[in-house]
Amino acid sequence: MMTPRLKEIFNKEIQPALKDQFGFKNIYMTPRIEKIVLNMGLGLDASDSKILKSCEEDMAKITGQKPVTTKFKKSVANFKTRKGSIAGLKVTLRKNKMYEFLDRLVNIALPRIKDFRGLSPKGFDKFGNYTFGIKEHIIFPEVSFDRADKVRGLDIIIVIKAINKEHSFALLEKMNFPFIKKGDN
């Protein structure tokens, strides 16, 4: 099996550059991506088996692996949810599939978003993990616009092993993530 393009770039260029930039003693101290979690909330549509199956197929096409269903933990009358009923779909990507997905996300999917100005650098938590949302899952070329019954959103969480969020930001910036610059609005 071939090594993904982004993983080769990470090992040969990005990791040594981060090591020099932050003055780490060895390459294992540099920030690295551990996993990517994608979540698609379905809400009340989850009770319809056709819609659920269609969304499962779309998530499988986008990520390359079968999604797992998530369930509501509590019943909330205002949201018409019942404990144990399906809330959405979730996929966790690691290793090669993770790098392949990131490559497609940054170079193909994000540029296809209409009026896209960049990702907000405010999506980092105190541990350095980056979270952002996409309003349309059809930006991925694997999903057919005509076949999609409804345009759905995706939550993407990039779990990064890093000392702080500045190191995480530097890692994603070197991976060509299109962040909004300070002066741009």
Please report, for each region that a protein language model flagged, where it lies by residue.
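Ribosome-associated RNA-binding proteins
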Residues: 1-185
